[in-house]
Amino acid sequence: GSEMCIRDRLGLGDMLDEVVKHFGENALKEEEDERPRIAIIGKPNVGKSSIINKLLGEDRVIVSNIAGTTRDAIDTTIKRNGTEYVFIDTAGLRRKNKIKEEIERYSIIRTVSAVERCNVAVLVIDATEGITDQDTKIAGIAHERGKGMIIAVNKWDAIEKNDKTMKKFTEDVREKLSYMPYAELLFISAETGQRLPKLFETIDMVIENHSLRVATGVLNEIMAEAVALNQPPSDKGKRLRLYYITQVSVKPPTFVIFVNDKELMHFSYTRYIENKIREAFGFKGTPLKFIIRERKEK
């Protein structure tokens, strides 16, 4: 309830004061920046920079391009239809003499710092290589941090295709990234510009969904209907009861469900409720977070 919010807010205020003390004015300015931030992530040489360059080329507006002093990521501002987007590129500097493992480790560290600063991550995969273990590892970084997610299969123009290629590729990606079924999937080419306008549309949609709020009344209707359709599990004669659901925050949308017994609320039933909410609101491209709280029966 509200007391929880207030308590959390106080805690957060103190924490922010501490943080600001250490970082001075600049850190705060970055926090207040409301522009959508998109991290372009992926293993080396999949075409991350070419995508940004191509997007820049299409719009011909470079608002700013300031190389980060302390980090390798370079922020590029692109203006489109009156909205400014900040693209965070994790390509970084190539050091020729570094060993492969070291480059991989650095690229993971860079990915983490970029992902932490973004709302939406675009994972770029090389169509000519298919989805690899390193791709799934990088995707996990964004998933764990609750970011909006788009998978862009690049160099789509460079592979031999028949009528089944896209279907097969889609199945492969979905299977390897089965923990993020919410991710949007696009097949693009930075080289030819194929579907790059669609990438922007998808970014807009995912940003909107990532900060979408659903009214409590509506959520409880959806939950009541879900419970009526599919009886909650019981254990040793005790049945799970779901009392109430409410959305507590966004980026990603986060919900609290009050139940009689947390132990009875299995992962699979939470997933079922999530699917019902997604059926109603889509929430494409964004993870949803659920917190289960116990309320003793009166």
Where are these regions (language model features)?
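C-terminal-of-GTPase-core extension/linker across diverse P-loop GTPases
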Residues: 2-88, 96-109, 113, 117-124, ...
